[in-house]
Curated annotation (Swiss-Prot):
Family matches, as InterPro entries: DUF5868
Pfam families in the cross-refs: DUF5868
Gene source species: Acanthamoeba polyphaga mimivirus (APMV)
Name of protein: Uncharacterized protein R44
Domain of life assignment: Viruses
Family of this protein: Belongs to the mimivirus L31/R44 family.
Amino acid sequence: MKYIKNNVLDLGSKDSYIKFNLSTVIDYIYNQIPLDYAEMNKIYKNICTELDDSPEFQSNLTEDDEYVYKFNEILKKCYDEQEMTKRKIFDPDFLNYKLINELHIYLTKKSPKKLVIKSINSIKLVNNEGVNTDINGTTNVDWKLHFWPEFTIQNSECLTLHDIIIACYKIKSHKFENWYELYCNMFTEFYVFQNSNDKNIWKEIFAVIKFDHGC
C-alpha cells in the first residue's frame, strides 16, 4: 500500500490500521518535527511568568496560539529499518516503517500544510497523564506556554498534517523534550466514529495518548 498520493495521506480503512498509522505519525512528529525553540522564544519573549522559582513546573494558564516547528531532514536511526534489523530490534508491529519513509521523503520537498488527511475531519487528542510537574527538561518557554489536557482539531473540508503537529504539541507540557515526558507510541483509548451527510462520508477520531513522565 502506498500511503501518500497526490498530497493526500491515507491512514487506512479499518480502525486498527488507522490506530497503528496515527500512532506512527505522532511518534514521527515528536522525533522529526520538533518545535523551534529559537523562534518560539522570540514570539513569547515578552510573556512574563512568576513561577520560575517554583519547585514544580506549571504551564501558563493563558491560552496561546502561535507555534513554530522545524523539520529534521536527517532521519533518526530509530526509523532506519536496516539499522534496526542489524541491531535485532526491528519490530514492524511497533511502527509502520514504510509510512515513516514515505512521510520523510514527502516532507523533504513539501510542507506539512500541503498534506491532507484522507476522510478524517476531526481528531481529539487527550494526554493521559496531564501536566508533568517535574521541572527537569523544561525550558523558559515552556513556562510561558499553555497546556491543553485535550485538544480537538476539526475541519469540514479536510485536516492536514500541520493540524496534527500543532495538536500534538498543544497537549504536551514539556514541549521541547521527549525524555521526561515521553510519548509511548500507544493509545490507552482509541475510537473511530463514522459520520455522513447527503454528500460525504467521513471519520472522527478520539484518542487518549499514553505518556511516560520518566523517573
